[in-house]
């Protein structure tokens, strides 16, 4: 038995960089084949001449046979592995890689997929892919193959090289637009002129090398909008740029870029959340980094510890043309940050640039990888060779325990390995699988030892201070084991958990590939009636000095109380791309934790499980870096939550790149809230935030609270007497604040959902309504506009007719009711605002119209204006406010950017100022210059100017209704 070796990658790029050939003799080539022997797996497909009519010397076209092998996995287990042995495999057409299928190469050398010179069909056009990550295989041949999407998990290519020869200038090696937990791993991309290595990006690219081509990576937003990681990789001799990107939320760690014009180019008029650290730029002839959209908070650039050699222009802002250039041949970018900055939580943020760049006399050695490499596969022991069954029925507990007692590295081929008690690893034990969807260690429901009340009992446990690797498996605690914690991790900082799925909830499959039902019919409870969410301990519990590297982990199990709980550890810990979703109370908790670095933490709340879930709770902790953190609420949410991050008794927390978002109107009230000081951070896009020691907040808000206790109020309007009206969507209610009597009045409760309000000239209350069974921003529902007398709503409700604009005499149009916010329009906002509107609703007065835009029901507020006037419209998704003219037919024309701020409402005041509801109330003058802000205790949604003398600003703000007197 060979001892398992932990080999850290010292100077891994030196293997391709002759100028830095200082590699120690005992360092393993990270770009060699990582699986040098065949790994037996009865449920996998082997792409060999024995099983398919192929050759492995590049002499024949194997395209159809390779597609057949992939299809066979889909037809048998649905999600699984195709093993490809060493050799050269020539293809001539696109290969569809179905959802959840992995291609894994093995042999002394990696197998090579070859597109030969001048292969027909790859000379021009788009979509000329060698490999296309796609969704599920269509059931009928007549159905179109769908691109991978936000539901495409666990597809991958590993330990396989791709070579595109000359004369295929339209070829793209991989179309990679999938969701989390897919990968391109341990690959070489040898490209020719015109080629792109990877088009659109997914979760992770690791240990990949890109040679030649126009671009190594050319990408937009990932399919689900999550972050992406490029780690321990190399780029050389791309003709245009190594990476062209927009909104990929890109983490670039320990990469080497050499002999290219540009390292990262952010597309024009687009933003990027970009983190680069511990990397090297060498011989870069044009600006190494090109930043666009520099004045927008979505642009978040954070760069740390980059060594530059022969790179005269480090960075250029595309809009202004400003460059950061240096004369020194060698220099280190110790820190660079651009975007919305909070020096601390007590100061007002601003968009700014900071940099700390120092010249060097000599380039330091490349930063070693902290990802442990696996031991040679000939030292792995196949658990099935020891008698394990892996069918999900037989009890494999004793066989696993004996294997751990006698062997170091235990390989689990595809299978579900049922156990009945904790599996406890020795200090050097490694558990290796190759596909966590089909390779699981699992409990059945009601496993005896996990019942009742008692201390958390792990399914898998690592020893304190151990050096362990757990990789490529799923950990499944089922739904009725209340003492269960899937993994209790106490191993030390040289350990690793990688490519692990904490099974349960979304994306859970049996061994036949059949999906386990997630929900009941109306998404209010589990699909298995006897299972209840939030009835187990945490999925991953890192404690008692536990640390190490945690990479590409998915924890969406709704039965667990949290996906991640890190407690009582000061050991070094690193998280790379961890997705924690769909819990009821908490997604991730850090308590008494120090010295961790977290890159690409993904947090998501589902409407069924998590409308009241706290995504990230940090207590009693310090010295933690969070790079490119994203907290998201799904489009089906119908209620807000107070904060995405809660801190308590913690300091020296460094957030670099922080986003919170939802496609609906129900945002987080605060991005971050500190419980000790009471300070909340409202902006949703932050480049730089330090949470340090905070004093208690003593300032008083600028507004007076009139009423509270609502769920979420918005849609405000004013009647002719200056009384404000507003809605509480969840409870389907319309309220009025009586200005003279200073009291709240309930106007009505509707059988449909009121969205927004307005009045016509005769005092009729106009209500945009929506009826929908399953709430989602992507489900338009049945949108109607009704009118009523607010003094007698039950007896006067009537539906307004939708009529063509062409049927209206433009001379009769006096008032135009418009959306003061459009919360889903993100790009090309000007075009969307000026898009033709063919129909409208005519109010009972005959002179007030409501243009029927396609997103009429997706607004926080309606406002009234007149033909010939200028209006202001905020875009929540774009976080901008635009000015728009109304023509003589009541249509919207000439949109233009007003300010780089906007969210839920925009109100034009009589004096020309514009009040914009965006975290607080921001007051801009008519030239777009910020004058001041109005501090509101809750996040404002809708604002109107009312009162008897039209001098009171009324503010709908989540659960409270506020006002403030507007001075002359």
Give the positions of each predicted feature.
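Extracellular "leader-to-stem" segments immediately downstream of a signal peptide or signal-anchor
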Residues: 2-6, 15-83, 91, 96-98, ...
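Glycine-rich phosphate-binding "P-loop"
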Residues: 51-62, 218-220, 383-396, 552-554, ...
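Conserved metal-binding segment of the jelly-roll/cupin
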Residues: 81-88, 92-94, 102-104, 409-422, ...
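Ankyrin-repeat and related helical/solenoid repeat scaffolds used for protein-protein interactions
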Residues: 270-290, 294, 299-303, 625-628, ...
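C-terminal, well-structured subdomains that either form a transmembrane helix-short loop-helix hairpin
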Residues: 411, 566, 574-589, 644
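Long, structured stretches of catalytic cores involved in phosphate-ester chemistry, encompassing
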Residues: 573, 617-628
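Active/binding-pocket-proximal capping segment
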Residues: 592-607
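Sequence-structural signature of mature extracellular/luminal beta-sheet repeat domains
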Residues: 693-968
């Amino acid at each position: 038995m060979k001892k398992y070796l932990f080999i850290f990658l010292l100077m891994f790029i030196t293997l391709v960089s002759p100028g830095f050939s200082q590699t120690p003799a005992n360092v393993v080539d990270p770009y060699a084949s990582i699986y040098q022997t065949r790994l037996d797996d009865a449920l996998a497909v082997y792409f060999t001449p024995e099983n398919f009519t192929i050759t492995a010397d590049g002499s024949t076209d194997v395209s159809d046979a390779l597609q057949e092998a992939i299809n066979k996995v889909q037809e048998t287990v649905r999600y699984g592995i195709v093993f490809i042995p060493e050799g050269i495999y020539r293809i001539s057409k696109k290969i569809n890689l179905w959802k959840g299928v992995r291609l894994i190469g093995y042999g002394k050398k990696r197998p090579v997929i070859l597109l030969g010179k001048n292969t027909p069909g790859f000379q021009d056009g788009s979509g000329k892919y060698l490999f296309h990550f796609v969704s599920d295989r269509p059931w009928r041949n007549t159905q179109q193959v769908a691109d991978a999407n936000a539901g495409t998990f666990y597809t991958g290519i590993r330990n396989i090289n791709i070579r595109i020869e000359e004369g295929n200038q339209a070829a793209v090696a991989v179309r990679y637009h999938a969701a989390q937990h897919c990968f391109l791993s341990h690959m070489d991309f040898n490209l020719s002129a015109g080629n792109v290595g990877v088009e659109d990006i997914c979760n992770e690219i690791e240990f990949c090398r890109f040679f030649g081509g126009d671009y190594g990576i050319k990408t937009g937003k990932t399919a689900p909008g999550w972050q992406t990681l490029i780690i321990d990789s190399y780029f050389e001799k791309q003709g245009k740029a190594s990476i062209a990107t927009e909104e990929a939320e890109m983490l670039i760690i320990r990469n080497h870029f050499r002999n290219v014009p540009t390292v990262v180019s952010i597309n024009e008029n687009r933003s990027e959340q970009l983190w680069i650290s511990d990397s090297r730029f060498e011989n870069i002839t044009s600006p190494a980094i090109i930043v666009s959209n520099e004045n927008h908070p979505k642009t978040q650039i954070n760069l740390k510890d980059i060594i530059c050699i022969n790179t005269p222009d480090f960075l250029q802002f595309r809009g202004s043309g400003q460059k950061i250039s240096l004369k020194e041949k060698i220099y280190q970018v110790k820190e660079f940050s651009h975007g919305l900055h909070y020096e601390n939580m007590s100061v007002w943020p601003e968009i700014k640039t900071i940099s700390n760049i120092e010249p060097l006399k000599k380039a330091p050695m490349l930063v070693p990888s902290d990802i442990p490499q696996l031991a040679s596969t000939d030292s792995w022991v196949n658990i099935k060779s020891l008698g394990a069954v892996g069918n999900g029925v037989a009890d494999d507990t004793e066989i696993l325990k004996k294997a751990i007692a006698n062997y170091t590295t235990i390989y689990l081929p595809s299978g579900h390995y049922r156990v009945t008690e904790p599996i406890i690893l020795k200090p050097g034990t490694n558990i290796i699988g190759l596909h966590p969807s089909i390779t699981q260690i699992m409990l059945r429901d009601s496993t005896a030892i996990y019942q009742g009340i008692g201390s958390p009992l792990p399914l898998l446990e690592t020893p304190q201070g151990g050096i362990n690797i757990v990789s490529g498996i799923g950990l499944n605690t089922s739904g009725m084991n209340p003492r269960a914690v899937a993994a209790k991790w106490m191993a030390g900082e040289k350990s690793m958990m990688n490519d692990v799925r904490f099974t349960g909830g979304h994306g859970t499959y049996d061994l036949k590939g059949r999906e386990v039902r997630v929900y009941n019919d109306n998404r209010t409870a589990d699909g298995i009636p006897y299972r209840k969410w939030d009835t187990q301990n945490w999925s991953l519990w890192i404690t008692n000095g536990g640390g190490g590297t945690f990479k590409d982990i998915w924890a969406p199990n709704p039965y667990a109380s949290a996906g991640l709980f890190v407690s009582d550890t000061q050991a070094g810990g690193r998280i790379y791309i961890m997705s924690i979703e769909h819990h009821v109370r908490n997604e991730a908790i850090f308590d008494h934790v120090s010295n961790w670095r977290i890159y690409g933490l993904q947090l998501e709340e589902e409407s069924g499980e998590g409308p009241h879930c706290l995504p990230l709770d940090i207590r009693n902790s310090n010295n933690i870096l969070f790079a490119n953190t994203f907290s998201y609420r799904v489009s089906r949410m119908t209620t807000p939550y107070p904060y995405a991050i809660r801190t308590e008794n913690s300091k020296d927390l460094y957030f670099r790149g922080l986003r919170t978002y939802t496609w609906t109107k129900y945002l987080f009230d605060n991005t971050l809230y500190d419980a000790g000081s009471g300070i909340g951070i409202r902006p949703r896009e932050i480049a730089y935030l330090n949470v340090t020691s905070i004093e208690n907040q003593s300032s008083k808000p600028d507004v007076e609270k009139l009423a509270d206790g609502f769920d979420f109020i918005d849609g405000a309007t004013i009647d002719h007497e200056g009384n404000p009206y507003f809605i509480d969507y969840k409870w389907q209610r319309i309220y009025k604040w009586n200005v003279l009597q200073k009291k709240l009045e309930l106007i009505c409760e509707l059988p449909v959902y009121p969205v927004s309000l307005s009045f016509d000239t005769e005092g009729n209350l106009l209500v945009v309504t929506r009826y929908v069974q399953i709430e989602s921003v992507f489900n338009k529902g049945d949108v109607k506009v009704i009118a009523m007398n607010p003094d007698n709503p039950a007896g006067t409700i009537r539906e307004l007719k939708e009529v063509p604009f062409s049927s209206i005499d433009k001379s009769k149009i006096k008032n135009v009711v418009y959306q003061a916010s459009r919360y889903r329009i993100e790009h090309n906002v000007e075009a969307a605002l000026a898009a033709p509107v063919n129909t409208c609703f005519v109010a009972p007065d005959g002179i007030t119209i409501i243009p029927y835009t396609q997103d009429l029901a997706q607004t926080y507020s309606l406002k009234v204006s007149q033909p010939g006037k200028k209006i202001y419209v905020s875009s929540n998704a774009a976080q901008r406010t635009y000015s728009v003219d109304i023509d003589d037919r009541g249509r919207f024309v000439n949109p233009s950017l007003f300010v780089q701020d906007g969210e839920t409402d925009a109100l034009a005041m009589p004096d020309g100022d514009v009040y914009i509801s965006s975290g607080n109330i921001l007051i801009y003058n008519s030239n777009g210059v910020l004058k001041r802000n109005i501090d509101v205790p809750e996040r404002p949604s809708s604002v109107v100017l009312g009162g008897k003398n039209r001098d009171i600003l009324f503010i709908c703000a989540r659960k409270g209704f506020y006002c403030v007197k507007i001075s002359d």
